[in-house]
UniProtKB/Swiss-Prot annotation:
Residues 1-30 form the signal peptide. InterPro entries: 4_helix_cytokine-like_core (IPR009079), Somatotropin/Prolactin (IPR001400). This is Prolactin-8A8. Disulfide bonds join C34-C41, C101-C217, C234-C241. Expressed specifically in the placenta. Predominantly expressed in spongiotrophoblast cells. Glycans are attached at N213. One of its GO terms (cellular component) is extracellular region. The keyword Secreted applies. GO terms for molecular function: hormone activity. Belongs to the somatotropin/prolactin family. The lineage of its organism: Eukaryota, Metazoa, Chordata, Craniata, Vertebrata.
Amino acid sequence: MELQFRQPHFSDALLLLLLSNLLLWEKASSIPACMAEKSGCWNPRMETFDSAIRKAETLRTVSKQFYVELYHNQFSSGKFATLTSKLVRRDEIVFRAASHCHSTLTNPPNKGIQYITIEIPEYLKTLINYVGAWISPLFHLVIELSAMKDVPETILSKAKEIEENNRQILRDLRWIITEVYPTSKKKEIFPSWELLSFLKSSSRNSKFLAMFNLSHCLEYDTQFFLFHLRILKCRITGKDC
């Protein structure tokens, strides 16, 4: 008995094509977003996180150097020695300058396991405000230091590098939240720095009190910038956990 083979109908071929395309689409949708590169797959989210983390590492290092420089450079060492002496004697104004950081008003998850329990969108918004809290103080620090005739280049250059890296980290965080949560409301609330008027004062004592506060808080905050960026990268991308 001769077997009869049915010629494929045009509609059957079209159905097969549609099914094939559907399977390809489902497979593609399960792969993390990336862009074709000669060396492989480029993931813009990963690249932006890595970029922000590198800047945060630089920011941390330069902030520590800036802190040490202000204590040892002839430009500021005398003023900082006087402020340290007052701090030991629990002078109220100096004690607050050394212990109160305006950035804490953003309520960063720096205690316990808050960084694990906080929702990711809220975590991103909080970190944006935490980093953003330094935009104005650092901008004015560079302006005021640039206007001081006796400021050493080593101090001024570090201030500029700190300001630039902080600004770029904020830019990266804004890109990430827009990319990951495009419909999320992105209300930014940057707390004001209470010692800004001291920094802009004509009194050198007031200026150095403001720098005393700024250097202490930066030395503290920058380690948490780096910590939170690494945690967020893990929680959002699942990499480097």
